C-alpha cells in the first residue's frame, strides 16, 4: 500500500457562498468554528452550477450533478443537456425507447408520469410536452398524463404556470388528457415512506383519490384552499377514473433516478412488498434514464455515460482504502452518484448509512442525524484504516428546502459543531480536510420576486476550505470537477489522465 496523506472531504449539501442577506441562514447562524476555519485557513469559492457542471446556462446545480462532477474529476454532461440537444436537433421523438412504447400502447393507454415544472433538477416540463406531442404524432390513441407538482425546486406555489402550459399542449393533442395530479411529496419519496408512495400509486393505478376535479387548475385551487403547497397537493383525480390496465405502456419522464425509483418499484417489481400492489402486466415501461441495477429489465431512453477512473475507482486501483458516509437522504449521492452512476462497490471501499429521522419535514428536526454521522466519522478517523473519507452532511439542503429560516439556522449551527469535531480528529491523526458544497440552498431562504419562501437551489458559488498542516492558498476559477484532483494532490498521488480538473490547493 502506498504511503499517502489521509484526506477527509466534507460535502455540506446546499451550503452556498453568500455574504449578506437577512434571509441567509449561514450568515445569521452562530458559527464560531466555521468563521475561524475561513479566517485562519485557505478559503475560496468554486462554481457548482450551469455549464461548469454540465448543465444548461442558468440552471442551478443539484446533489446528483454535484456528486457526479466531484467524483469524476471532470465536467460530466448532464442528462438534461443531452435531452435538450436531442430536442434542438429534432432527434427526441425518434428515440427508439419512445417509439417502441408508442407501438406497445396501440389498443391500450400510454401513461406519461413526471414532475411537471421547469426546475430542471429531476425533470423538465419541455421534455414532457415534447413526449405528448410525439405520442400524438405517432398515433397513440389514449395518452394519459400523471402530473407530479413541484414546489421544491420551484417556488412553493408556482404550479399554476406549469398546468396552464400543459393545458396549451393538451389542446394541440386531442388524444391526450391530464388524468391525475399530486404533489411530489407522495409520488417522489426516496426514504421508503411507503404510506406516501401508496397514495400516488392508488391514484395512478386504481384511480382512487380523496379528491376529484374537472381539470388541473381546479384541482390546484382546491389544494391551495386546503392550505397545501404544490409539493404537498394530495392525490386528485381529474375527470373520469382512468385506472391503469394490463397492456398499457408507461414512460416515466424524470431524468434523475433517486426519487423515481420507489414508484417505479411499486409499478414493476413482482416482489414489491412496500404495500399491497396489483401485479400489472404492462406492455412496456420506459425510464428516461437508468434508474439503477434493480431496474435492468426496463427500457431506457437515455442510457448512462461511462465514467472511468473517477476518484473511487482510481483509489481502488492504487490499493487504497476509502469510506463513504452519509445519512439516508444523501447516501446515494456519496455512493452511486459519486461513483459515476455505477452500483459498483470498489475493492477497499466501505460504506456507512446512518438512518435519517422519520419526520414529515426536516424543519421539525433540523439537526437530522448529523451528530451520529459525526460520531461515525470520528470513529473511522481514529481507526486510521482509511486513506480517504467522503462525507455528506444533508442539513443545509434538506432543511433549506422547507423554507423555514429559523430551522435552517439551527441546521447550520448543528453543522458548525460537527465540522469542528471532524477537523480536530483529522488533524490529530495527521490528515487534512477539504470542506465544500455540491450546490447552494440555505444561504437564500426568501424569494422576493414571488414574495414567498425560497425552497429551491441557487446558482451561487460554493465554499472551498483547506485545513491541513501545510501552508497553501486556494486558486481562483475552480469548479466541482477540480475537487478530486485536489484531493489526490493532497494525498501525494497524480491524477489519472481521464480527469480534466486540476488541483485548487497550491502548496507554498
Swiss-Prot record:
Binds 2 manganese ions per subunit. Coiled coil: none annotated. GO terms for biological process: glucose catabolic process; glycolytic process. Mn(2+) 1 binds at residues 397, 401, 457. GO terms for molecular function: manganese ion binding; phosphoglycerate mutase activity. Keywords: Glycolysis, Isomerase, Manganese, Metal-binding. Its cofactor is Mn(2+). It catalyses: (2R)-2-phosphoglycerate = (2R)-3-phosphoglycerate. The active site is at residue 63. Pathway: Carbohydrate degradation; glycolysis; pyruvate from D-glyceraldehyde 3-phosphate: step 3/5. Mn(2+) 2 binds at residues 13, 63, 438-439. InterPro entries: Alkaline_phosphatase_core_sf, BPG-indep_PGM_N, Metalloenzyme, PGAM_B_sf, Pgm_bpd_ind. It holds the Pfam family Metalloenzyme. One of its GO terms (cellular component) is cytosol. Substrate binds at residues 122, 152-153, 184, 190, 256-259, 330. Its EC number is 5.4.2.12. SUPFAM superfamilies: 2,3-Bisphosphoglycerate-independent phosphoglycerate mutase, substrate-binding domain, Alkaline phosphatase-like. PANTHER family: 2,3-BISPHOSPHOGLYCERATE-INDEPENDENT PHOSPHOGLYCERATE MUTASE (PTHR31637:SF0). Belongs to the BPG-independent phosphoglycerate mutase family. Monomer. Catalyzes the interconversion of 2-phosphoglycerate and 3-phosphoglycerate. This is 2,3-bisphosphoglycerate-independent phosphoglycerate mutase. It comes from Laribacter hongkongensis (strain HLHK9). The gene is gpmI.
